């Protein structure tokens, strides 16, 4: 008796621990019985009940047990309608190419705005492969209202009127250096293009405000005359022989400040100037003015000699 009671007790505990397992098995058995008991003519009937959502307290995915198996109600697992999910996937697939095409159009517009307004003979064609019209305007309207730079306007004006540059040169007006693309050549080999074809195109369009003026002979002469007026060593003192490096000055005599020996008369500036063309005039032949005496008239003993007595002695000796 005790063993039987113990076995029944264990069976009840096992049933409490795993009630879901028995319910699932019973649901499967009931579903099979209902399918087998159904008539073949009901298979082609209305199946709209299969798509109806079954509200069960046990949650989605669990089998629903019929109230009574004898009433002919079929117990089916709860399923959700997946039509909305499939439609959303299809709509997502169709919208993806449209989004890519829209992004491609935006990229084309951005590229045109970045390089818009630049025209010239060597500009790259904007047609995409097939040579047809790409749908991008050559001169798009200013939609955002941003002010355009003056460089682009000048380039457009010069490209539209190439004869204006020749008129400026004929009138003698200085030609302003402009940045941007090069203009078409007016002569053979671009010789008369004034070097525009060699200018590199810059993205920032830095404008040069200076003008190029060709110097004339009169202007060069005026510049040379102005430079001659300026002193070469302004504010610098002339170097004396004593201060010149590498030279030695002879000792000066107390009677002769020019550095010449006592028996030789001092050399003057006139002797150096006239030494090439005319014979030099010696200082000895010159007569000093009245009231003055020369340094050479003083002998070594310090006694002065009157010039008249010296001339008389020479005459008597002659």
From Swiss-Prot:
Ranges annotated as biased composition (Basic and acidic residues): 7-20, 83-101, 150-168
Q: Does the keyword Phosphoprotein apply?
A: yes
What highest taxon heads this organism's lineage?
Viruses
Q: Where is this region: Disordered?
A: 1-23, 38-318
Q: What are the alphabetically sorted keywords of the record?
A: Phosphoprotein
Modified sites of kind Phosphoserine: 68, 125, 192, 249, 257, 260
Bias class Polar residues marks the residues at 50-59, 191-206
Which region is the signal sequence? none
Q: Which residues form a coiled coil?
A: none
Extra remark beyond the main annotation: The P/V/C gene has two overlapping open reading frames. One encodes the P/V/W proteins and the other the C/Y proteins.
Q: What is the designated name of this protein? A: Protein W
- Name the species this protein comes from: Sendai virus (strain Harris) (SeV)
Chain's gene name: P/V/C
